[in-house]
Design a protein with these regions (language model features):
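N-terminal helix-loop segment corresponding to the beta1-alpha1 unit
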Residues: 1-156
Length: 156
């Protein structure tokens, strides 16, 4: 039996937890998720314990949990060749999930407005710690954030 998102393609430009968790839920619901990772480095979450061993290979348990049911490619979106490949992927996608530092993809010419011209039907999910809805930017909207930062600032 097909799952609810079977046939939906998601391009996931993500790292650590917020983006991977979001796209994990989409993958669990049947979407084809293609995770973009930096060549030679990958998602930094790959190096965070605890590690589990399988067939003599140690892997980060958290990374494996949040990135299940996904495909993954190493792609340098900072050079022209990598940008072109990324744009081609987006042209054939339904959704982009992105949780990089606010403004970083815009500087590369790969932000929402850039990608929307390539694929007018694209759904673009940008995850940030302090929000970044155009026209409603708060004083911290350009700052990167992790869960612990939000907890500290809210007094939890």
């Amino acid at each position: 039996m097909d799952r609810p998102l079977t046939g939906i393609r998601v391009i996931a430009l993500e790292q650590y937890m917020a983006g991977p968790y979001c796209s994990m839920l989409l993958a669990d619901a049947g979407a084809e998720v293609i995770k973009i990772e930096r060549p030679g480095i990958g998602d930094p979450r790959r190096s965070i314990p605890p590690f589990v061993e399988n067939n003599g290979i140690k892997k980060a348990g958290g990374f494996m949990a949040y990135n299940r049911n996904k495909k993954s490619i190493a792609l340098n979106i900072r050079n022209d060749e990598g940008k072109k490949i990324y744009q081609d992927l987006v042209k054939n996608a339904d959704v982009v999930v992105e949780n990089l530092r606010p403004g970083s993809v815009d500087k590369l010419g790969l932000g929402y407005h850039d990608l929307k011209t390539l694929n007018p039907k694209l759904i673009y999910a940008a995850i940030s710690g302090f929000g970044r809805l155009e026209g409603y930017e708060g004083p911290d909207s350009k700052r990167p954030a992790f869960d612990i930062v939000a907890e500290a600032m809210s007094g939890i």
